[in-house]
Amino acid sequence: MSDLFEDPAPSRNTPEFTVSELSGAVKRVIEGEFGLVRVRGEIGRVSRPASGHLYFDLKDDRAVMAAICWKGQAGRLSVRPEEGMEVVATGRMTTFPGQSKYQIIVEDMAPAGAGALMAMLEKRRAALAAEGLFDAGRKRPLPFLPRVIGVVTSPSGAVIRDILHRLRDRFPSHVLIWPVAVQGEKCAPEVAAAIRGFNTLPEGGPIPRPDLLIVARGGGSLEDLWGFNEEIVVRAAAESRIPLISAVGHETDTTLIDHAADRRAPTPTAAAEMAVPVRLELLAGLDGQGARLSRCAAETIRRRDQRLRDLARALPRLESLVAGPSQRFDLWSGRLSGALGQSVAARRARLEPLGAHLRPRLLADLVARQKDRLGDRTRSLETCLGRRAERARDRFDALSARLAPAFARLIAETERASRRDAATLGTLAARLDAAPEARLARLSDRLEALDRLRQTLGYRETLKRGYAVVRADGAVLTTKAEAGAAAMLEIEFQDGRLSVGRGKTRKPKEEPPAQGSLL
């Protein structure tokens, strides 16, 4: 019975190992048998200690494997490991003798299939959208006519050729190309650096700062376009102070940079069409605006001319304005002379009955005093009447002087209106300065033709045809009566002015006889 509890005797042919020797042997076998392997599984229990190394598990429904990614390699992984993500890890198998377990040293990692990529893409899109990077309020309008366009794409391939060809056909512009890798590990950092690099260019520097950016790439699979879904690219596009057009892939391809860009183009060619207008269409629009401008200028001149003619017809003649007051003056002057005679006769009639009752000496004294008083009043009345007549004459002369230059002021107003119209046309022409030089030259010719027309309609052109302007004391004379009353005439011909004196003076009007004595 005691033999049942005794250990069997070891075979003399079975080797004996220490724990370290056996662990080392297992390590060598695993590392030699499984070199570089690719393992598919779900990530679980992710740990990131202060050392910078990355520890996590790879598992499926039946087994779990430990995985390690050293610090130097963890920063270069194309996918950031997150718990629950299904990935394909590439690395080398080894063991950890201290705990007697095997593990994989991960060198690279990628999502396992399109489904995993789409799940990760949707999760990243939701996180960035929650930060407000895709808000419509952040998007800027594209410049109407950019002088410099920056293109971020591969320097070779059909994409850049299509963009340059389309820009050349529509509106040739200055294009700066920032060459980048459009797929692979270098794609995301190079694209982000290019966007930020264009934004750091100073205004007025040796390299012109773009007014518009285009990030372009041709079509491809989800994996090929993955670089444009990276967070650094999306943030660079959202932070760009220069308006940006995303033209990545075909119309059915959508990347995260499309949401962050100010505009999304379905193709690189469509991006070029969004960037610049068609030059021929601009020229056609400019022709139409120039024609409308010419019609507007002609209509303005026609309305001003018609207004001047209407004012000239509505202005009364000088003779009709002066005729009424002059007739009233003559009437009152005649009545005044008759009233004086009647007043003297009435006083004489009152004095004659009294003379019979008065002594001669007393009567003579009374008559002398009355005569003196009457003489004083007569002289005062004559002085007053003279001053009133002089003031009335001065008022009539002033009225005549104000009305005589009326036509001259109308002519001056016409010239000022023409100058204002010319200035308006000049301002409108200056606003069109950015248009092509050929169109500007044609507009300038039209403006010069209008200016020549203005000069032709001026009175100086009329002087060249044999007419003359007659002035007296700086005022324009329009009637024979005004010319006959002037002492000196100034005649303006087309080549200068000539002063002319009258050959004989008009005989002055005789003064009325003084009031005689009553006795």
UniProtKB/Swiss-Prot annotation:
Cellular-component GO terms for this entry: cytoplasm; exodeoxyribonuclease VII complex
Cystine pairs: none
Superkingdom to which the source organism belongs: Bacteria
Disordered: region residues: 500-519
A Pfam family per the record: Exonuc_VII_L
Signal peptide span: none
Principal location listed in the UniProt entry: cytoplasm
Subcellular location: Cytoplasm
GO biological process: DNA catabolic process
Molecular function GO labels: exodeoxyribonuclease VII activity; nucleic acid binding
Keywords carried by this UniProt record: Cytoplasm, Exonuclease, Hydrolase, Nuclease
Catalysed reactions, as listed in the record: Exonucleolytic cleavage in either 5'- to 3'- or 3'- to 5'-direction to yield nucleoside 5'-phosphates
EC numbers for this chain: 3.1.11.6
CDD domains per UniProt: ExoVII_LU_OBF
InterPro entries registered for this protein in UniProt: Exonuc_VII_L, Exonuc_VII_lsu_C, OB-fold_nuc-bd_dom
Family membership: Belongs to the XseA family.
Subunit structure, as described in the record: Heterooligomer composed of large and small subunits.
Function of the protein: Bidirectionally degrades single-stranded DNA into large acid-insoluble oligonucleotides, which are then degraded further into small acid-soluble oligonucleotides.
Protein name listed in UniProt: Exodeoxyribonuclease 7 large subunit
Name of the encoding gene: xseA
